[in-house]
């Protein structure tokens, strides 16, 4: 599931840290990294 935007709490990166939730969004070239347990 690709998000339209990466939430403000997240960040765009080619590689997220192990603790982060890996997500995809249209405004990110690679991955949208989100903090664990985010809502």
Curated annotation (Swiss-Prot):
GO terms for cellular component: extracellular region. It is found in: Secreted. Pfam families: Meleagrin. Gene3D superfamilies: Antimicrobial Peptide, Beta-defensin 2, Chain A. The modification Pyrrolidone carboxylic acid is found at residue 1. Coiled coil: none annotated. This is Small basic protein 2. Keywords: Disulfide bond, Pyrrolidone carboxylic acid, Secreted. Disulfide bonds join 6-33, 12-28, 16-32. InterPro entries: Meleagrin/Cygnin.
């Amino acid at each position: 599931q690709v998000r339209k935007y990466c939430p403000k709490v997240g960040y765009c990166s080619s590689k997220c840290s192990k603790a982060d939730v890996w997500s995809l969004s249209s405004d990110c070239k690679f991955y949208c990294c989100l903090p664990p347990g985010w809502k």
